[in-house]
């Protein structure tokens, strides 16, 4: 019917348009990297070099909550997800009140708050924190077009800088980068 044809046409146009825009952006970025006047190329980590197969970042917490509920027979798995979201928000609020110039919170600070606001034993909270790290390591994948740009920058002798404002510990971020094939860079700023 006509309505289905319009919907299909609209979806096809969206993906064609999105693909075309991404391709054009990639070509523009390649030209910039090849520019001899450009000496340094900087890449953000999450959602640029690396992606996670979740619609929203908090979707990882849904999986974390399900695994926690199963491991400890907690029942209400949504409570763990909400506690994790609340702990991050509270940690950020506290940090901002105490030190407005500080960049960002750490995973340890998030889980210190999580421990305060939950009724869970601290050993369970530690397990949840470790599981979150394992899930991040498991579900971070290489973004292929960004890897091509990264490799081009390395190949052309540019100084390559990687940066992120992520709360994960530096050693975990380095492991994610290594797992995704990003081991040769000049500087890492967190």
List each model region and its residues.
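Asp-based, Mg2+/Mn2+-dependent phosphohydrolase catalytic module
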Residues: 3-8, 12, 16-37, 173-190
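Conserved phosphoryl-transfer catalytic core
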Residues: 56-98
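Substrate-recognition/cap helix-loop segment adjacent to the acidic, metal-dependent catalytic center
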Residues: 118-119, 154-161, 166-190
């Amino acid at each position: 019917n006509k309505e289905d044809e319009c919907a299909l046409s609209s979806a096809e146009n969206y993906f064609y348009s999105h693909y075309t825009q991404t391709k054009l952006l990639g070509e523009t970025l390649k030209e910039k990297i090849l520019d001899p006047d450009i000496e340094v190329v900087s890449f953000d980590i999450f959602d640029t070099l690396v992606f996670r197969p979740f619609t929203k970042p908090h979707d990882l917490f849904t999986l974390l909550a399900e695994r926690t509920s199963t491991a400890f027979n907690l029942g209400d798995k949504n409570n763990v997800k909400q506690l994790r979201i609340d702990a991050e928000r509270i940690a950020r609020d506290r940090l901002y009140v105490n030190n407005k110039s500080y960049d960002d919170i750490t995973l340890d600070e998030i889980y210190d708050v999580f421990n305060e606001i939950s009724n869970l034993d601290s050993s369970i909270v530690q397990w949840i924190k470790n599981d979150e790290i394992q899930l991040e390591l498991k579900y971070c994948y290489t973004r292929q077009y960004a890897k091509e740009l990264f490799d081009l920058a390395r190949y052309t002798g540019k100084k390559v800088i990687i940066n992120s404002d992520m709360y994960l510990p530096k050693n975990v971020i380095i492991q994610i980068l290594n797992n995704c094939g990003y081991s040769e860079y000049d500087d890492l700023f967190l």
